[in-house]
Amino acid sequence: MPHSSHTQQTKTHEAAAGYSPRLCNDDLAPTRDQNWSWYNIFSFWMSDVHSMGGYVVAASFFTLGLASWQVLLCLLVGICIVQLCANLVAKPSQMAGVPYAVICRQAFGVFGANIPAVIRGLIAFAWYGIQTYLAANALMLVLLKFWPSLASLTSSSFLGLSPLGWLSFATMWLLQAMVFWHGMNAIKRFIDIAGPAVYVVMLALAGWIVYKTGLDGISFTLASKSLSAGEQTWQMITATALVVSYFSGPLLNFGDFSRYGKSMGEIRRGNRWGLPFNFLLFSVVTVVIVSGTQSLFGKMITDPIETVSRVGNDLAVAIGLLTMITATIGINIVANFVSPAFDFSNCAPQKISFRTGGMIAAVGSILLTPWNLFNSPELIHYTLDVLGAFIGPLFGILIADFYLIKRGRVSVDDLFDDTPQGKYWYRNGFNPKAIAALLPSVGLGLIISFIPTLHEVANFSWFIGVFLGATAYRWLARDEREVQAKAAFRSGAVAQ
């Protein structure tokens, strides 16, 4: 069971039998298996960073017209902000041993928590389908390279996908489902291997490129344009904000994983190695590879799949492509599968288990036909920007509630109490103050996202959302904060 001087905890795991069945099942109840070490958290972040999307994003920062030291400074500052936020959001879930959807009951109410849970689940749901499609494309490249005769299966189309495309998508879908179906321990073992495996391939690829081009063929400034001092300053601020925004999704539901941490010390150590150290190393290796492609192939290639496919040795190509596919499976599971599994389970615990919630997302990803979504960037923009406008305010409200209002305390039993006597019952299971803080904060985020003249400001929408959500909730819940402060004074407890 989780243990903390600030956690009013259940006596044993069997006490879950006394929890409301409308709020609890074996997957949502406080876990007894808090056995994740710093390395497991480190591997989680490796799986999140080491992806085709992460590769393209890391390379893009070096095309902004900034000097290499400026880019690295932006990456360092941005990822340190992510590290700080990860430490903050990890604590309540680690203390209580519950996932993100359950800890949200503190701020939104035992039923109101379904609002942030479903929002995060839908975001992950959409990205899960898109990432599976990208992995399927990589698999299709492998198949066509070694069996060119399969090209005949790409000539026709059904619902926007060729027969070979369907075969590849189904294969990736099943592989991910197999890992997920065996539970969190299988996921932990998978990401422990996936992250380091990508490093082996990337370092080998970087070494091959340096061998082919020589050190003179490597440049840490990939842009051809030059910027004024003012433009450089603005680009640096923007780049820093984009780093944080890139991690905003998995950051919000990091509690789904921190709940398994042995201690906050282990989690902080894992975050330190998995974020600043890992992200900077990955970015440097990425830019070595990308800049080398300019010298080696005559054009800059930002797609790792295309770069690997140009290596002369067939065995090396196969290993490289399969590792990239593994990396995509890794990020898809940790960022886009686990989240909806817990989030959808939270909506109807007795009807939807962790497995069922995950399979809802998996089946839904097929019905979404993500290849059609991916081929319509405007539709992706509008769909995900609308959902993304919620992420900043949700994070701000969650953090403000735990640290400023609840003063670092969690009443675990009350997270599963659906009676009016429960601390998190509020008004019929919903906290009107949290909802009132969320709606205008999201509304402003949507305005920023969809007004073209505010395009530059949109890069900071996560920060704006966090500030608005936290500030509005802090003000609306000021009476509760005073009550909590008096209770803490009477008990002699000091919030950390």
Please identify what each model-predicted range represents.
Residues 144-181, 196-205, 236-254, 277, ...:
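Transmembrane alpha-helical segments of multi-pass small-molecule transport proteins
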Residues 1-68, 202-206, 212-215, 227-240, ...:
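Membrane-interface "cap" regions at the ends of multi-pass membrane proteins
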Residues 38-54, 168-175, 206-213, 224-287, ...:
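Hydrophobic, membrane-embedded alpha-helices of multi-pass small-molecule transporters
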Residues 18-108, 112-115, 125, 249-276, ...:
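Transmembrane helix-boundary motif of multi-pass solute transporters/channels
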Residues 119, 130-136, 167-209, 222, ...:
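Membrane-interface loop-to-helix entry segments
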Residues 132, 136-145, 197-224, 246-247, ...:
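Hydrophobic alpha-helical segments and their helix-loop junctions in multi-pass secondary transporters
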Residues 394-475, 486-490:
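C-terminal membrane-solvent junction of multi-pass transporters and transport-like membrane proteins
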Residues 53, 77-85, 119-131, 196-211, ...:
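Selective recognition of specific alpha-helical transmembrane segments in multi-pass small-molecule
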